[in-house]
Amino acid sequence: MSFTTLLVTALTASGLGLGGPVRAQDHQHAMTPSAPAAGDARQLVKFPEPMRLHTITSMRDHLRALQEITDSLSRNDFEKAASIAESRLGMSSLEAHGAAHIAPFMPQGMQDIGTQMHRTASRFAVEAQTASVGNDVRPALAALGVVMQQCVACHAAYRLR
């Protein structure tokens, strides 16, 4: 089974799926960052502007980390994938992201999802290290899907301002 097939299987199993290539011209939204689309039922979380900017920057780094992890997995560089996951997404990344300073501004549910994301990233790191020994990437991909589920859950429930 190819890496791509395994990735699609893991993403589909995690509920994320793949709808084909994403193109910017297919995603012209009728909303601005300050005016959410009608019917946006996500809970608005108001952060002081410096905290909002820090949180957005942190989430963008999380997304870059996921891309780097996926790239590392595609090259069978499981140790690098594990290292990226733990240092930038895992429980040991909390201090670097300033989690203790941001958490008081988050609703409890958002805090819980964030904590789960960091925990599942640490679990993924262990699965990626195990893959380097056994050369079976499937458990690592499944664990990565669980990490991404936390991101999807948080972005589906909350919006920042």
Predicted features by range, described:
Residues 1-3:
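N-terminal secretory signal peptides that target proteins for export/translocation
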Residues 5-17:
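Bacterial N-terminal signal peptides
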Residues 20-24:
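Sec/Tat signal peptide C-region and signal peptidase I cleavage site
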Residues 25-75, 79-161:
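Sequence context surrounding c-type heme c attachment/ligation sites in exported
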